[in-house]
From Swiss-Prot:
It holds the Pfam family tRNA-synt_2d. It catalyses: tRNA(Phe) + L-phenylalanine + ATP = L-phenylalanyl-tRNA(Phe) + AMP + diphosphate + H(+). GO terms for cellular component: cytoplasm. Belongs to the class-II aminoacyl-tRNA synthetase family. Phe-tRNA synthetase alpha subunit type 1 subfamily. One of its GO terms (biological process) is phenylalanyl-tRNA aminoacylation. Mg(2+) binds at E252. It is found in: Cytoplasm. Tetramer of two alpha and two beta subunits. It comes from Aeromonas salmonicida (strain A449). Its EC number is 6.1.1.20. It comes from the Bacteria. The gene is pheS. This is Phenylalanine--tRNA ligase alpha subunit. NCBIfam families: pheS.
């Protein structure tokens, strides 16, 4: 009995002094293995009488259990210690739950362009695109804006040289389409345009969508009907709309289109008019046979009105707090 107590004490001391699981397993084999101390002790029970064996066996098992409990406790402590050291050494805790991958969303300007393309597509308009670096003929001359015309000074144009520039509108796409396609023509031209201006309602780069219809019997009445349908479908409201006389070099007559805001004030949303005969002549279309109408709108302005944004510059600052609202 005294010998067992000494062995248990010795085993516990060895167990407490172990600093790794492998050494701890060696101690387990030494005391509890098939050839370990307690296995050998159980073999000595055969030399005892039948009356003595139960009591002696119980003492051996009790001592064996004490060693087993000490082994289990030390193993748990070593495993926890090893895990803590590993976590402290790792820059990434691979046991942490994964981070959810957020789905991206379309930029509000992109959403507006797609919406405009879809609405006009339902009315039979095709999408045409053209170069953003434009020459003087397609950006000005063919649009009834000759070199001496005062309207050229109205555009704060970015020039590369006297006849090459960043386009100030997508009207050049209309000219290129009419150069290569005979009427009937029914297109819209979305894209980036550039003007040297920057404030709450202007940026050096912005987006426009311009539309063109050329046919034998195109009329201002048809133009009004198309724009009425577009605006009411775009804003999803039965808006009050007015056409206000205006001036553009490339259309005659010309008008600007306003919608009544919720505050009772008129808001300008786009410009339009009948294509000027000089524009048709510049691309080889007979204005005696064909007529046409054109319209143009700023995408950012329509986006601001639809979503209630006050500062145009917010669309280009890449602030996720702002952009996530449109997902």
């Amino acid at each position: 009995m005294q010998q067992l107590e000494e062995v248990v004490g010795q085993a516990k001391a060895e167990i407490e002094g172990v600093n790794d699981v492998a050494t701890l397993d060696e101690i387990r084999v030494k005391y509890l293995g098939k050839k370990g101390f307690f296995t050998e002790q159980m073999k000595t029970l055969g030399a005892l009488s039948a009356e003595e064996r139960p009591a002696a066996g119980a003492v051996i098992n009790q001592a064996k259990q004490q060693v087993q409990d000490a082994l289990n406790a030390r193993r748990d402590a070593l495993v926890e210690q090893e895990l803590n050291q590993k976590l402290a050494a790792e820059t990434i805790d691979v046991s942490l739950p994964g981070r959810r991958i957020e789905n991206g969303g379309l930029h509000p300007v992109t959403r507006t362009i797609e919406r405009i393309e879809r609405l006009f597509g339902e009315m039979g308009f095709k999408v045409e695109r053209g170069p953003e670096i434009e020459d003087g003929f397609h950006n000005f001359d063919a649009l009834n804006i000759p070199a001496h015309h005062p309207a050229r000074t109205d555009h704060d144009t970015f020039y590369f040289n006297p006849d090459l520039m960043l386009r100030t509108h997508t009207s050049g796409v209309q000219i290129r389409t009419m150069e290569h396609q005979q009427p009937p023509i029914r297109i819209i031209a979305p894209g980036r345009v550039y003007r040297n201006d920057y404030d709450m309602t202007h940026t050096p780069m912005f987006h426009q969508v311009e539309g063109l219809l050329v046919d034998e019997h195109a009329s201002f009445t048809e133009l009004k009907g198309i724009l009425h349908d577009f605006l009411r479908n775009y804003f999803e409201e039965d808006l009050t709309i007015r056409f206000r006389p205006s001036y553009f070099p490339f259309t005659e007559p010309s008008a600007e289109v306003d919608v009544m805001g919720k505050n009772g004030k008129w808001l300008e949303v786009l410009g339009c008019g009948m294509v000027h005969p000089n524009v048709l002549r510049s691309v080889g279309i007979d204005p005696e046979k064909y007529s046409g109408f054109a319209f143009g709108m700023g995408v950012e302005r329509l986006t601001m009105l639809r979503y209630g944004v006050n500062d145009l510059r917010a669309f280009f600052e890449n602030d996720l707090r702002f952009l996530k609202q449109f997902k």
